[in-house]
Swiss-Prot record:
Protein name (database record): Translation initiation factor IF-2
Stretches the record annotates as G4: 450-453
Spans annotated as G5: 486-488
PANTHER family per the UniProt record, alphabetical: TR-TYPE G DOMAIN-CONTAINING PROTEIN, TRANSLATION INITIATION FACTOR IF-2-RELATED
Known function: One of the essential components for the initiation of protein synthesis. Protects formylmethionyl-tRNA from spontaneous hydrolysis and promotes its binding to the 30S ribosomal subunits. Also involved in the hydrolysis of GTP during the formation of the 70S ribosomal complex.
Residues annotated to bind GTP: 350-357, 396-400, 450-453
Domain of life: Bacteria
Ranges of compositional bias, category Basic residues: 235-248
UniProt keyword annotations, A-Z: Cytoplasm, GTP-binding, Initiation factor, Nucleotide-binding, Protein biosynthesis
Region (G1), start-end ranges: 350-357
CDD domains from the UniProt entry: IF2_eIF5B, IF2_mtIF2_II, mtIF2_IVc
Gene field: infB
Length: 841
């Protein structure tokens, strides 16, 4: 027995001697000095006291974990061996007798409850069947006497009929007894069933036995297949029931295809589509491979492709639009208030050579207040003019780009269209296009017959040509006013403005100035010093500096607003064009502008629109383009160039069809998938999108719906007015070559040092040639602060009052610009030439 002193024990347990002596006295030991000896029994007594003091239970462990490890060697080819180590772990838990008894009692209670429920259900089922038999027996007993009186053996059957009523009392025990008996002999019920279904003779001779066998299966099967079997499975499968009986009424695979409702948004991935159809993603990928399109499970599909896949696989498709955010935005923009009259918004349209720009310049010079040098800054595309009868807002939209964009988005930014027609030139294809734009938008027309001061002017011919296209003059009984004007002399301009204001009174244009501002973008640009600048036309409400605006997929707070004269303004009412600064990007022409209450909402909608546009653009990245078709012309298989062709007249369409179908050889061919007479419509654009075709327009133009699809889907659309150009371009496409590009080479740059007047040419710019050489009769651009404000032709070039064909760098010269008088000191005149350069793949 090991004996140690108190001091040594204190050192072992790392406790001060005084503290250890105190604990020993508390344990009932008689030690008082550090040199006294401590025996093992005294150590055990001290340990027991310390454990009881910390409330630690002194008991044996209830759970024991045993780990077993075995190592073996596995021989493989090449005289190599691999060592394999297998580890096993077993856990033994010791339960107290009380816990074991409680567990056993709980299982007994659960089993007894299940058996009672099964017995009660069997009794109810037997009682129900007995009642049904009792109701059916009187009918049989009434028909039996007529046929059974001569036969004495039938009497027991008639006596048994009334006795069927008290059967429910004894039906349940007999059913339980049969059930227990049949569980011990599982093969007998099948034999009895076969005998019961054996033949007609046995059923005729023993009808009472047949009725018993009809009632027997119900109580025998029902209790066992529901509660008792499920209870036996919960007990770990130790029940006496057969497992195969559980599958008697189990799941069976459907015999026919399951048709599901598939909701498809504007974009959907292959995995999401397969999940909605309850098929494996591999099936969808295999189907796409058969269609010739390899995809992955995470690839984004557009709405049309996903709809085709789901319908081909036999499912119902519901097309949904992810516009919940847009709908909530539209609800928040509704405003009710008092409406007042507003100024009309007028767009001037027509052929570029018919005097549209000259008419606008005259109206601007005549109606803008004096003191504003040069009138209105030319890069602003919208301005308003004050007249005696009210204000008129003009939209200067070259090429009608903003007008078609507005129509594509359903906006009614333009109220009246002034159609300019040259009296000496007549109706041109672009004039017809302008009429179609106005009719499609539901905008009234005012026809301005320009150049009436020329000798060849014929007003009746203009009326006759326009009446063919549905524009009838008021003099001829129609509703379209015709005004004869001369933009050069100023004749009839006041009458034209009078007619425009009269049309505005008929339209009864209204607006609510107290509402939040709402408008449309006329144009936008990126200014070097001010950032994104957008020219917007306020359509309704009032736009104020500091408002949070949402413009298409861009947003921002208005930091500054400028009117058409470049002066800062604090607010702008209906029909007033202004420039706004503060957006996070340059919006597209035609985008709608709305004033929102908070920045969070504006940012959320803008990001939603950007993501939506990005997804749709990625999904449609493989749309048919002419360049993509040209790049693949060198492949071995025969290629087909699909074309949708629209012409102005039937004769041109037939000639083009014959010429294009005759092109091609063994490797390439042309196929005209669609065509017709008239402008390019939305259905034509959809046909080109579905067939990966190119849109060709011969003397026709696309309407707003078609241009919207072309812009969104990235389709290739080309306009022609010479039949040989179409044939030549298609030949180049079929031979793997592209048409030529027009490249501009800058020849020289001159800076305006002084401006003086000439009675013959108007404003003459005294310039110093800074770079290159300035040539006469070459196209030029006028730049103000490095921004193009005019493009025209150099009409006069002189040096020391002598005409010069060219002036080199470092020399001074006088330059006269054709049809342009707004030259200022500091402007730069850029002379360039256009060179055709062949494109290469």
């Amino acid at each position: 027995m090991t004996q140690v002193t108190v001091k040594e024990l204190a050192k072992v347990v790392d406790t001060p001697v005084e503290r250890l002596l105190q604990q020993m006295r508390e344990a009932g030991l008689s030690h008082t000095a550090a040199e006294q000896v401590v025996t093992d029994n005294e150590k055990q007594a001290l340990l027991t006291h310390l454990k009881s003091g910390h409330k630690a239970k002194v008991e044996e462990p209830r759970k024991i974990t045993l780990q077993r490890k075995t190592t073996s060697t596995l021989r493989v080819a090449g005289s190599k061996s691999i060592s394999v180590e297998v580890r096993k772990k077993k856990v033994f838990v010791q339960r107290s007798p009380e816990e074991i008894e409680a567990e056993r009692k709980r299982e007994m209670d659960e089993r007894r409850a299940v058996e009672n429920a099964a017995r009660q259900k069997a009794e109810e089922e037997a009682k129900r069947r007995a009642e049904e038999d009792a109701r059916s027996q009187p009918a049989a007993s009434q028909s039996a006497p007529a046929a059974a009186e001569p036969v004495a053996a039938a009497e027991p059957v008639r006596e048994a009929a009334p006795a069927a009523a008290p059967a429910p009392a004894s039906a349940a025990p007999s059913a339980d007894a049969r059930k227990r008996d049949e569980q011990r002999r599982p093969d007998k019920p099948r034999a009895d069933d076969r005998n019961a279904r054996g033949g007609d003779g046995e059923r005729k001779n023993a009808p009472h036995r047949a009725s018993v066998k009809e009632k027997a299966p119900a109580p025998r099967v029902a209790p066992r297949t529901t509660d008792e079997e499920s209870d036996s499975f919960r007990r770990g499968g130790r029940g006496k029931g057969k497992l195969k009986k559980r599958n008697a009424h189990g799941f069976q695979s459907p015999t026919g295809p399951v048709i599901r409702d598939v909701a498809i948004g504007e974009t959907i991935t292959v995995g999401e589509l397969s999940a909605q159809m309850s098929v494996k993603a591999a099936e969808v990928i295999k189907f796409m491979f058969k269609m010739g399109t390899p995809v992955t499970i995470n690839q984004v599909l557009d709405q049309e492709t996903a709809q085709l896949i789901a319908e081909e696989l036999g499912h119902k498709v519901t097309l949904v639009s992810d516009n919940a955010l847009e709908d909530s935005l539209a609800e928040s923009l509704k405003f009710e208030g008092e409406s007042f009259s507003r100024a009309p918004v007028v767009t001037v349209m027509g052929h570029v050579d018919h005097g549209k720009t000259s008419l606008l310049d005259y109206i601007r010079r005549a109606k803008v207040a004096a003191g504003e040098a040069g009138g209105i800054t030319q890069h602003i595309g919208a301005y308003h003019v004050e007249t005696e009868r009210g204000m008129v807002t003009f939209l200067d939209t070259p090429g009608h780009a903003a007008f078609t964009a507005m129509r594509a988005r359903g906006a009614k930014a333009t109220d009246i269209v002034i159609l300019v027609v040259a009296a000496d030139d007549g109706v041109m294809p672009q004039t017809i296009e302008a009429v179609q734009h106005a009719v499609a938008a539901g905008v009234p027309l005012v026809v301005a017959v320009n150049k009436i001061d020329k000798p060849g002017a014929d007003l009746d011919r203009i009326r006759s040509e326009l009446s063919v296209h549905g524009v009838t003059s008021e003099e001829w009984g129609g509703d379209t006013p015709f005004v004869s004007v001369s933009a050069k002399m100023g004749t009839g301009v006041d009458e034209l403005l009078e007619a425009v204001l009269l049309q505005a009174e008929v339209l009864e244009l209204k607006a609510t100035p107290s509402a939040p501002g709402r408008g449309v973008v006329v144009e936008s640009r990126l200014d070097k010093g001010r950032g994104p600048v957008a020219t917007v036309l306020v359509q309704d409400g009032t736009l104020r500096q500091g408002d949070m605006v949402l413009v298409g997929s861009n947003f921002g707070r208005i930091r500054a607003m400028l009117d058409e004269n470049g002066k800062p303004v604090k607010e702008a009412g209906p029909s007033i064009p202004v420039e706004i600064l503060g957006l996070d990007g340059t919006p597209d022409a035609g985008d709608e502008m709305s004033v929102l209450s908070d920045e969070k909402k504006a940012r959320e909608v803008a990001l939603f629109r950007q993501g939506k546009f990005r997804e749709v653009k990625l999904a449609r990245a493989h749309a048919g383009k002419l360049e993509n078709i040209f790049e693949n012309m060198g492949q071995a298989e025969k290629k087909t160039l699909n074309i949708v062709l629209k012409s102005d007249v039937r004769g041109s369409l037939e000639a083009l069809n014959g010429a294009l179908n005759g092109l091609g050889n063994d490797e390439v061919q042309v196929r005209v998938v669609g065509g017709g007479v008239g402008g390019i419509t939305e259905s034509d654009a959809n046909l080109a999108l579905a067939s990966n075709a190119v849109l060709f327009g011969f003397n026709v133009r696309a309407d707003a719906g078609a241009r919207k699809i072309v812009e969104q889907e990235g389709l290739d659309m080309r306009y022609y007015n010479v039949i040989y150009d179409i044939i030549e371009d298609v030949k180049k496409a079929l031979t793997g070559m592209l048409g030529s590009d027009v490249r501009e080479n800058i020849l020289g740059i001159a800076e305006v040092r002084d401006v003086f007047r000439s009675p013959k040419f108007g404003a003459i710019a005294g310039c110093m040639v800074l770079e290159g050489t300035v040539y006469r009769n070459r196209p030029i651009r006028v730049l103000r602060e490095d921004i193009v404000i005019f493009e025209g032709e150099l009409e006069s070039l002189r040096r020391f009052k002598d005409d010069a064909a060219e002036v080199r760098a470092g020399m001074e010269c006088g330059i006269g610009v054709k049809s342009y008088n707004d030259v200022k000191v500091g402007d730069k005149i850029e002379v360039f030439e256009k060179v055709q350069v062949a494109r290469s793949l």
